Amino acid sequence: YFAERNKGAYHNLFMTFSGNPQFVELKGNTITEKIKFISRANWQMNTDLEKALLKILDVAIENHCSQEEMPKSLIIISDMEIDRCTSQNHRENFYDYVSRVYEEHGYKIPNVVFWNVNSRHDVFLADKNRKGVQLVSGQSASTFKNLIGCVDKTPVEMMYEVLNSERYQAIQI
């Protein structure tokens, strides 16, 4: 779904998450063919989020993308069994480091969404004040809608936006 809506150099690309994430071009004419194709991708069941974010930047640099052509969000649909976000040792937080690298190349880092689709874990990989990182859990259409509408907010800002939405106006305390 997301890959098909990407623009420019990112159109029809999805990323495998592993110690060495790769972009893969989505193939197939039907939803069944696409799901089968995605399931055959090289999923190593671990995540180096730093490399994933830098891979997005590499595509932008190689294709001379404008900021408007860049993905607005990196949506990590996961069971949250993420081992760690980086294999590097930086003096600064990996997210701050990657943000700085993006800025050095004239880009803004994409919003990062950790979408926990397995409720057996309550582990999230960001603090409540990290702007540009959202934490969501669940598999409903309303989760998807809220996720798309909260780009570039902190987890707390996103929570308040959801709780203050029309859906919850009927709740009185």
Label every model-predicted segment:
Residues 1-173:
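Acidic, glycine-rich A-domain
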